[in-house]
Each structure stands twice: as structure tokens, then as C-alpha cells.
């Protein structure tokens, strides 16, 4: 079922293959009603494809394998809540389009109200995520991370939240948009700490050297922003206050 890459000269539609984490709402996830992959980033990618006459191929990836998928040519880009900061030189980036923060989620009745309360606690994060990198050696919050009892890595945030619900971890470090989605969909038994771990921005990451495709998608993104499509989708997914495309 592997998609074959088509060249531009192919008479059929050009395929635009987007790599994404399939458990990363509201950016990319499986809609349980339709059984289809959807989300803010995937709908935005579809809008670009509609402009270009391309066929969107949605390719779920293991987040820890994203670089291999990109470098092997299995995907054209990584488009899924992808943090630019600290990785500026590793990819050909689109303009930043979402302002993001890394935050910490805890159970409402945990007694944890600030970052300092995480001392000697078990904290979960996704493997190869921006949150994990922040808290590990060399990260901006390395000092905080060292106060934890342990940082536990999970392949996706649904698993991390299951551990939080079970009480095997005390907190989850994650992106604010995903955190809000999870908190709202879990009977509000959880809270996001007021103190952020950082502020950062999302971009679309293309393989180094692939400036042609990056430039094309970037131009389309600007057009979609000017036409109001980006804000329309952002409202649909509850992240309208996080869009930064118009900021200069």
C-alpha cells in the first residue's frame, strides 16, 4: 500500500505526501466518526493541494522516525505541530504559522500548582518531542528536569495521558494546543499549569535543499492566510489565538 512517488512530468496528479503524528489533536488525528485522518494541519495541507491541483497523501509516522522518513523520500514534509526553535538549520522551513508553548498538565486534585512542585515527581513526555528536548541535557529547562524523580518517554500523548489517569506519572509535558484539546476532552479533570516551559513557533519542515517545494507551499500558505482560510480553520480547531502568519 506504499505510495509511489510521482515525478512532476507524470500525467496523473502530483502527490504531496505529508508526514504527521496520527495522535496529535487538534493538528493531526483520526476522526472517530468518519475513520479519516483530519486536523488543523491536515486541512491546511489539503487547502494547499486544492490550490496546486495536487493529491494529498496523509502518511502517519512515528515521531521519532520523522527524519528517516523525510530523508528516505517517503514523505515530502513534516507538517504537524513541528517546532522550529532549536532546529533552524536542520530543515528547509516554511514561515512560522503558529505560536506555541510547551506546558505541563497535571490532575486537578494533584496539589501541583507550579513548576517547582514537580520536584521528585514522575513527568511524561513524547519521545523526540520539543518538550522532552527542553527538559533533557542541553535543553533550556534542563535544570528543572533534573529536579524530577524521572522523565518517562512515551511514543504518543494518548499513552502518556493514560499513565497520568492511572497515576503512574504525575504530570505530562506537552504542546499547549494539544494540552487544551486533551484537557477539554477528558471531563476537565486536568489542568494546565500557569507557568509555561517556553514559547516557540511551528513551521512546516522540508528536506534540506528542497527549497523549491518549500517556496511553493510557503507562497500558498500566505495566500490562504490573506484569504482568511487559515483563521477560519484555526477557529474550527480552537487555536485562533495562536496563529502568527500575519505577524511581522
What residues fall within each predicted segment?
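Ligand-binding cleft/hinge of the Venus flytrap
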Residues: 30-31, 45-54, 131-153, 183-187
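Periplasmic-binding protein-like
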Residues: 22, 99-106, 176-180, 184-222, ...
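Short glycine-rich His-centered loop
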Residues: 15-38
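Short helix-initiation/N-cap motifs at beta->coil->alpha
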Residues: 42, 57-68, 151-163, 200
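A ligand-binding cleft/hinge motif common to bilobed small-molecule-binding domains
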Residues: 65, 81-90, 134-137, 162-199
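Acidic, polar ligand-binding/catalytic clefts
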Residues: 46, 55-117
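Short, low-complexity disordered leader/linker segments with a strong preference
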Residues: 1-15, 244-248
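Extended ligand-binding regions for polar small-molecule ligands
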Residues: 42-51, 112, 116, 121-122, ...
